[in-house]
Amino acid sequence: MTERKREYKDRKQKKNSPKNQSKVTKFLKWFFIGVLLLGITAITIVGFYVLSIIRSSPELDVQAIQSLNQPSILYDDQGNFMDNVITREQRYVVKSDEIPDNLKKAFVAIEDERFYEHKGIDIKRIAGVIASNIKGKLSGSNTVQGASTITQQLIKNAVLTNEVSYERKIKEMYLALELEKHLSKDEILTTYLNTIPMGGYQYGVSAAAQRFFSKNVSDLNLIECAYLGGLTQAPTSYDGLSEINKENPSRYLNRTKSVLFKMHELGYISSEQYNNAINEIDTNGIKFKPNNKLSKTNFEWFTRPTITQVKQDLMNKYKYTQDEVDKLIANGGLKIYTSMDRNLQNNVQKVLDDPNNYKAITNNPNEKNEDDVYKLQASATIIDYKTGHVKALVGGRGEQPAMSHNRAYYDLKSIGSATKPLTVYGPAIDLGLGGAGSVVNDSPLTNKELSSTGYKDQPKNEYNSYRGPLTFREAIKISSNLAAIKVANEVGVSNSIAYGEKLGLVYGPHSRGISTTALGQFQNDPNNPDGGNTYTLASAFGVFGNNGVKTNAKLYTKVLDSHGNVLLDTSTPEEIKIFSPQTSYIVYDMLKDQVESGSAKPAKFGNIPVAGKTGTTTGDKDYLFAGLTPYYSAAIWIGYDKPREMRTSSGIVTSPIFGKIMGLAHKGLQYKEVEQPSGISKIAVCMDSGLKPTSLCTQDPRGSRVYYDWFINGSAPNQYCNYHTNSHVNNFNKNNNTTGVNEKNKKQETKTEEIKPNENNKSNEQTPNTNPDNAPNNVPNNDNNNSNNIGGNMIPPQNQTENNTNNGVITPNQSINNKN
């Protein structure tokens, strides 16, 4: 034996010796102990991890989950049913006995065949999915497959998010086990079938039955049940109404057959039923009958803005996220009590629909567009401005598709001259710059005025002439653009915008000049919508009957949760002080003139006082009228969705409609007036200079130029008229060969006596706070700081010609028909 062989044999003997075998055994022993300890440690860590996830799970609110079976409902102002809430996520709740057995079995067969056997989770299914997921991890696919039972899917839809993660899956499994302890299988299945996503905006089998087959869920046949059962796995892929599936229906047809096969395999349907259904699909496919009116509510114009407002108020009060409030509104069983007067809402709709109201605009008011909607449109809003409750809101004419844009609430447009009481004359009076009897010159802008207002070219009046000296009352009655520009220039753009924003108007970045504040010409950039609508205007004009206080408009009175607890309550109005009571009354009194003797006479109805203002936008593309009575405020808009010029004037069309709908709103109401506040007086002024009159102002050959109108105490002019002088009156008489001055006046022609105020026209002499502090907070009092035009005299008399009549100027007391 060689030496090498002897060494090998010795080593082998040593290796097999009892001592070495003991070492191997010891190693294996400790190895397995280590593995065991490692396994126990891992299991412990995983256990604590799972436990921590379970502890972080949201609390299971069984009542909240069951409330998913309670639709939110809207009621009118009398507490009568009005609408079910239909959000963009459409869901119609049905009871268990309304759901066909075939539909229940279809879902169980394809989604969770051991549903009636497990306690919330399917262990057998979980084991298979775990193996598949481990394989995916090892292969690098990182795909997490689900093993969700119907109970787990309900938990995911009702409580958790759609996040794909192990943490969410663990929470889902734990909560599913808990839910099964509280609800029966039928309760779980019914709630699941009412909430399962079914493609598009449809949630629940009832909404899906309507969308695909225009049927109540209880009327579905076997094939239709099988189709809906298979849809939920991949709603987009199996959507039989999609264009791609219309061209190639094999995907959803095969899926439906798979559901039928599984139902037959589990014994839910007989062989005969199965074979007949398969033959029907092979021969005729699946017959769909889509319902295009699925998402339309009974009171579309009022209901959708109400839902929008309730959502916003819930988010503001309870700090809900958008997703949370969407689910609460859609599924939370809320009871929303609206302020809608059902009869008034229906009757206002009838008035707006009536083609006879638009004959002055077009010979074919009912011409329709490609969507079968009237081209000529209108909107209207009526508000109880004391409470802020909206009584009627109509967003368009005629029958329109669901989710049509609401012209009364959502659309923003230019408002034309309807802005003048809100951002011109109201602020001017409120800031102490004048009163109803103050005078402004309706004449071309001077170079200084062109510069300060930013106009490059001379702006014009709608009536294409100049009227000379006008009182505020007359200027707003005839809607003088030049007068409004001059007064707005004194108020200041920033002041006007501050008032306008508080009143609800929206000013975009390109709508912050004097053409907007004086004339209501908003840019309405599609990327920055601005302006107003009938909802904002009706609310804004209410301030003139409510002591200058704007009550925020509300479409609902209260909102209750599914247990009857009050979530929202508008019984206490949200109020914002805009103008002083004195300002608001004076503007209200001025606005009555356009209805009593101006271009808006048809707005008058019965014996109820009416005040209002017309509005026309550039190019006659929008007609508006906004106004109020001692009871309600309202606004009307008429125009085309694709703007075009209209061939008449705003007052001719809008004011009759205003009169009709407000007549309906005031049916049975007694005469009353807006209460006159203390702190205002009717003061004598000269209607040419706007200053305190002298006896010479009565000797004008045109007749006495002395005029009485409302001023806030302390704001009337304190300087005497410097327009009517002896020489001025004599020149008038000489130039006009006037013999109309009576002997009494001849005796007085050398005197300049003060005209005393009419004591009968004075109210309580308590002086109100007429300081510009009444302006909105943190707003400068005047942008331009011009020294003239402040107080009673808005025009420098020295700039007036003596013979005004030769310059196309007519006197303010003449009858004027104005388009605006």
From Swiss-Prot:
Key words of the record: Antibiotic resistance, Carboxypeptidase, Cell membrane, Cell shape, Cell wall biogenesis/degradation, Glycosyltransferase, Hydrolase, Membrane, Multifunctional enzyme, Peptidoglycan synthesis, Protease, Signal-anchor, Transferase, Transmembrane, Transmembrane helix
MF (Gene Ontology): peptidoglycan glycosyltransferase activity; serine-type D-Ala-D-Ala carboxypeptidase activity
Cellular component annotations (GO), alphabetically ordered: outer membrane-bounded periplasmic space; plasma membrane
Active site: E111, S417
Region feature (Transpeptidase): 378-663
Single GO biological process annotation from the record: cell wall organization
Region spans: Transglycosylase: 72-244
Subcellular location as annotated: Cell membrane
Disordered, as annotated region: 732-820
Reaction catalyzed: [GlcNAc-(1->4)-Mur2Ac(oyl-L-Ala-gamma-D-Glu-L-Lys-D-Ala-D-Ala)](n)-di-trans,octa-cis-undecaprenyl diphosphate + beta-D-GlcNAc-(1->4)-Mur2Ac(oyl-L-Ala-gamma-D-Glu-L-Lys-D-Ala-D-Ala)-di-trans,octa-cis-undecaprenyl diphosphate = [GlcNAc-(1->4)-Mur2Ac(oyl-L-Ala-gamma-D-Glu-L-Lys-D-Ala-D-Ala)](n+1)-di-trans,octa-cis-undecaprenyl diphosphate + di-trans,octa-cis-undecaprenyl diphosphate + H(+); Preferential cleavage: (Ac)2-L-Lys-D-Ala-|-D-Ala. Also transpeptidation of peptidyl-alanyl moieties that are N-acyl substituents of D-alanine
Polar residues bias spans: 808-820
Membrane-related topology note: Single-pass type II membrane protein
UniProt biased composition (Low complexity): 732-742, 767-807
Biased composition regions of type Basic and acidic residues, renumbered to the chain: 743-759
Pathway the protein acts in: Cell wall biogenesis; peptidoglycan biosynthesis
EC id: 2.4.99.28, 3.4.16.4
Topological domains, Cytoplasmic: 1-30
Extracellular topological intervals: 52-820
Membrane-crossing residue ranges in chain numbering: 31-51
Function, in words: Cell wall formation. Synthesis of cross-linked peptidoglycan from the lipid intermediates. The enzyme has a penicillin-insensitive transglycosylase N-terminal domain (formation of linear glycan strands) and a penicillin-sensitive transpeptidase C-terminal domain (cross-linking of the peptide subunits).
Family per record: In the N-terminal section; belongs to the glycosyltransferase 51 family.
Full protein name: Penicillin-binding protein 1A
